[in-house]
């Protein structure tokens, strides 16, 4: 029934007359119904440009403090990362990296180590920037396989860093 009313309100001339027999009456209730159906089909008024998420606006920013970076954790994680990257890139040495595996691993390790030591503050703070920096630095130095090395670094970091942080700090 509602579909017929909608169809009658939208394009009465294009429909077959037998479909309009129930909805073509001119009673006041059918016109009210048509208006309410059409009212629901219209899009909502646009939101103001300065729309702010109420939850974020009302939340106290003190609730979102992260701990300081832990240099010992950064050193341990960097050595694990270097070991893994050396193993991973050696597997693809012939395809992408050639004789530059150690140089590429050193670049990636230096960048990740700096990030972990100064910027990583626990789960939720692992950013994409160090991995973009890895790719850019490898390319700037003219070394091969920048995208592949950055991808391998991201895969390892996603799998290990947050988990190792939780084990290190005892937050399970």
UniProtKB/Swiss-Prot annotation:
Biological process terms from the Gene Ontology for this record are: regulation of gene expression
Main localization category: plastid
Which keywords does this chain's UniProt record carry? Chloroplast, DNA-binding, Plastid, Transcription, Transcription regulation, Transit peptide
Q: Does the keyword Chloroplast apply?
A: yes
* Subcellular localization: Plastid, Chloroplast stroma, Chloroplast nucleoid
GO CC entries: chloroplast nucleoid
Q: Which InterPro entries match?
A: PRIN2
Q: Which domain of life is it from?
A: Eukaryota
Q: Name one GO molecular function term.
A: DNA binding
Q: Which residues belong to the transit peptide? A: 1-54
The UniProt function text for this chain reads: Required for the activity of the plastid-encoded RNA polymerase (PEP) and full expression of genes transcribed by PEP.
What's the name of the protein?
Protein PLASTID REDOX INSENSITIVE 2, chloroplastic
Whose protein is this, by species? Oryza sativa subsp. japonica
Name the encoding gene, please: PRIN2
């Amino acid at each position: 029934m509602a579909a017929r009313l909608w169809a009658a309100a939208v394009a009465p001339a294009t429909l077959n007359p037998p479909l309009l027999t129930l909805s073509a009456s001119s009673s006041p209730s059918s016109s009210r119904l048509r208006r309410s159906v059409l009212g629901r089909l219209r899009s909502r008024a646009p939101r103001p440009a300065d729309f702010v998420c109420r939850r974020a606006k009302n939340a106290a920013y003190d609730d979102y403090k992260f701990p300081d970076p832990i240099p010992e954790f950064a050193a341990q994680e960097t050595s694990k990362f270097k070991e893994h990257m050396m193993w991973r890139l050696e597997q693809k040495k012939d395809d992408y990296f050639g004789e530059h595996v150690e140089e590429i691993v050193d670049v990636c390790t230096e960048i990740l180590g700096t990030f972990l030591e100064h910027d990583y503050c626990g789960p939720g703070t692992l950013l994409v920037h160090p991995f973009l920096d890895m790719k850019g630095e490898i390319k700037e130095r003219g070394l091969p396989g920048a995208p592949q090395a950055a991808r391998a670094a991201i895969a390892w970091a996603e799998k290990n860093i947050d988990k190792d942080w939780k084990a290190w700090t005892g937050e399970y």
